[in-house]
Structure formats: C-alpha cells, structure tokens
Amino acid sequence: MEALTLIRPHESETKISRQADRFMPLPERLLLAISHQPENQCGQLSCKEETVDSALALLQHAFNYFEREIAGKRVLDFGCGYGQQTVAMAKAGAKYVAGLDINQKFLQRGRDLAAQHDLDGRVEFTDKLDECQLGSFDVVISQNSMEHYIQPVEILKIMKSALHPAGKLLITFGPPWFAPYGSHMQFMTRVPWINLMFGEATVMKVRQRFRNDGAMKYEEVEGGLAKMSVAKFERLVLQCGMKIQHKKYECIKGLDFLGKLPVLRELFINHVNCALVAC
C-alpha cells in the first residue's frame, strides 16, 4: 500500500499545539506521552520492499507443506498486492496463478513483473473473477489481510466460491485484535495493548498527529481494521460453511503453549495460520 504523508508541523504550529495540549483530556495526554514520530514514511523499522525471491517466506513458514500444496495446481492469490507472491508461486511450480486485487496500479505492476519472468499464460492479474473461474481453483491464498476486511463474512464466501469442492483455503494473518499490537499502531508507540488501555476515540485523536487521513474509527484507517480476534475468525469460518483442517497459532516470544489457554490466548496469539476446507 502507498504510505500516507506524515505531519511535520512548523515551529509556530508546534507552539500553538503545545498550548492546546494543556487542555487535552488526561487519556490523550498519557497516550501522547508514550508516542513518537515514525522512523520513516512506512511507519515501520524498515521500508524494504518484498522481492520475488523472498515473497513465499511467510507462507513456507506458516505451512510446512506449502510448495507441495501448490505444485501443479490452479491457485488464486486473493489480495495479491504488487504481485511478487503471485509470480513466486508460479515459479515454485503452480500450474496457473491468478492475482486478484482492486488496485489497478498494483495489478499493472504485477503484469509487468510476470512479463519480466516470462510467465505469460501461467500468471494473470485481475480485479474480478469471471463466472467460469468460480469453483475452479485448487488453492486460494490469503496473506496478512483477514484483519483488515470490514465485511469478512462476504470476503470469506467469495474465497470459498472460487474453490472447487475439494479445494483448500490457506489463510495467514496477524496480529489479531487482542494481540499486543493488534491495533496496528506500533508506528506511533511501542507500548502494547493500547487498544485495551485506551478508548477508540482517544487512540484516533492521538493518531491524527501522525497520520492525516482523517480516520475517526479503526475501520476508517488505511486498509481498515475489523477488530478481528481469534474467536471472531473461528466463528466466521463456521458461519461460512467451512472448517479448520489444520491450524498453527503462533504466540509472542515463541511461547505457543499460551495459545491453548481459554480466553487468555487472545492476548498472546500473534499470528494465525489456518488451512480451511468446506464442511
């Protein structure tokens, strides 16, 4: 996704802001005190762009059998972004890979990338699935997107409709909502669980000092945040007529046994990896 512009106030604006800070509600003042300017335009420690060679690293980690799963198969890369992952899957042995995204700039970059790797005919980029493609894919991939879908039931149903009856949906995403950085606000503070310590209005108010998109709710931030907890995801899977065939819940600091604790698991599961099939 394209990075948002950071707000860099002039000295005069800073003085006015400091005066206004004195009348700021206490929760906002507390959150602001533990916040900081992002280190770069991405708001992350690094802006390094993914390459085709590294694009499958997360999927290979999440699913030990990943390359066997896609070998000789028809694969749908749901939310393909710039297409590095789509191209990488074709190079790793997939028979055909379709990259699906609504961003036309992403799709064009993906097409250019496929041409560079001489994959015309084996890789396609599109913003919608044709009727004839529904029910035709062996594997559907969704990586680091599930927590962003504001209408997750509809999205899961679309993914399911793309699979043939014996197909498999591989979903990996994180952090879920109640994880230490489930609010996705680590660009402005390294303090964990701020979505539990501060109300939504407080977090959004302080966020305005670092992002200028006008978001007043979590769902309005760039990419959207659907407050996707682990339990919510598991309910959605059942609601869509699917079941979890295999799962790997990764917890903070590698303490995966915490993922087995009722209720408390929500605080420690940092990444969700699931293989889904139709019930």
What do these predicted regions represent?
Residues 243-253:
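Conserved S-adenosyl-L-methionine
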Residues 153-165:
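A short glycine-rich, Lys/Arg-flanked "PGG" loop and its adjoining helix->strand segment in the class I
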Residues 170-200:
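Conserved class I S-adenosyl-L-methionine
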Residues 261-279:
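Core SAM-dependent methyltransferase catalytic element
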Residues 144-148:
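Short catalytic micro-motifs in class I SAM-dependent methyltransferases
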Residues 105, 149-154:
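Short N-terminal helix/helix-N-cap motif within the alpha/beta-hydrolase-1
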Residues 183-187, 216-232:
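Acceptor-substrate binding/catalytic loop of class I
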Residues 1-135, 139, 143, 226, ...:
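Conserved N-terminal segment of class I S-adenosyl-L-methionine
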